[in-house]
Amino acid sequence: MKTPKMNVESFNLDHTKVKAPYVRIADRKKGVNGDLIVKYDVRFKQPNKDHMDMPSLHSLEHLVAEIIRNHASYVIDWSPMGCQTGFYLTVLNHDNYTEILEILEKTMQDVLKATEVPASNEKQCGWAANHTLEGAQNLARAFLDKRAEWSEVGV
């Protein structure tokens, strides 16, 4: 039975056919003024087989959201997937996949050098007790270890 087309791009992705980790272009939108928004699916864990624990995911979200902007001014957002298998990276007016891979690599290398999770306090975070620098660094290290596979989505 054919699955009906959904409005959300990721709901149309056959999650049984992908091979994490990977980075893929999930969507492109052209604005009425000509701006281009590109959303990347940055998958760390194999869907329906593995997931990131919440404190590690939460800490990696904070670290990457802060650090990636040191490498790219066109980043709009870095947000976690509810399924806890990856993140979405959204950029403005930038459509160079190879450069995105490079800034992700640099960012993950910087995560490994971090000495604290940024904004992991009650004033700046809604769940400040839910962080682990070590867990975030383990996720970044595992992702970097598979750098050669990031372009192999499997679909």
UniProtKB/Swiss-Prot annotation:
Residues binding Fe cation: H58, H62, C125
Catalysed reactions listed for this entry: S-(5-deoxy-D-ribos-5-yl)-L-homocysteine = (S)-4,5-dihydroxypentane-2,3-dione + L-homocysteine
Co-factor remark: Binds 1 Fe cation per subunit.
Top-level taxon of origin: Bacteria
Required cofactor(s): Fe cation
Keyword annotations of the record: Autoinducer synthesis, Iron, Lyase, Metal-binding, Quorum sensing
Subunit relationships: Homodimer.
Protein name (database record): S-ribosylhomocysteine lyase
